[in-house]
Amino acid sequence: MASKRALVILAKGAEEMETVIPVDIMRRAGIKVTVAGLAGKDPVQCSRDVVICPDTSLEEAKTQGPYDVVVLPGGNLGAQNLSESALVKEILKEQENRKGLIAAICAGPTALLAHEVGFGCKVTSHPLAKDKMMNGSHYSYSESRVEKDGLILTSRGPGTSFEFALAIVEALSGKDMANQVKAPLVLKD
């Protein structure tokens, strides 16, 4: 069986934990992860001044698709940059149309709203993004730490990054694989 593929879109101002933890967990599960820089291949300064080097540019990554999941990290500035990108919109719309999984965490779900993706789904987000997500009644809102409704998977923030990442693994590779990856992480149940 061919390994699953994930695209993580990295924008300036992304939240570090919400980027790195899903990348790490998915790679532990054998998922081929591409970290794509929204503004190109140059290192990206994240919300807490951690610098992450993308594998490639988003433009280049798009030519290597499709992906089994597209992941949108949060961070206020990062989510704003994702929300303002025509290329992100194109990728999300293609993913939605081909019935591929889309996962967004913290403020990342606001990019779904901006690009009119997943309307009608139940979502969650960082508590400070709730009002924005509920503007226009395009979604129903959940206070769950992780919410999966069909092919839209959302989560709340840095503290839910492991749960979010394991939910992506479970959606792509099954519960057994998620449990196998989780065991050595010494997470609190």
From Swiss-Prot:
Feature type site, description Cleavage: 149-150
Modified residues (N6-acetyllysine): 148
Lineage of source species: Eukaryota, Metazoa, Chordata, Craniata, Vertebrata
Modified residues (N-acetylalanine): 2
Source organism: Rattus norvegicus
Keyword Nucleus recorded: yes
Cross-link (Glycyl lysine isopeptide (Lys-Gly) (interchain with G-Cter in SUMO)): 130
Name of this protein: Parkinson disease protein 7 homolog
Job description of the protein: Protein and nucleotide deglycase that catalyzes the deglycation of the Maillard adducts formed between amino groups of proteins or nucleotides and reactive carbonyl groups of glyoxals. Thus, functions as a protein deglycase that repairs methylglyoxal- and glyoxal-glycated proteins, and releases repaired proteins and lactate or glycolate, respectively. Deglycates cysteine, arginine and lysine residues in proteins, and thus reactivates these proteins by reversing glycation by glyoxals.
Modified sites of kind N6-succinyllysine: 182
Primary residence: membrane
Modification type Phosphotyrosine: residues: 67
Processing and modification events after translation: Sumoylated on Lys-130 by PIAS2 or PIAS4; which is essential for cell-growth promoting activity and transforming activity.
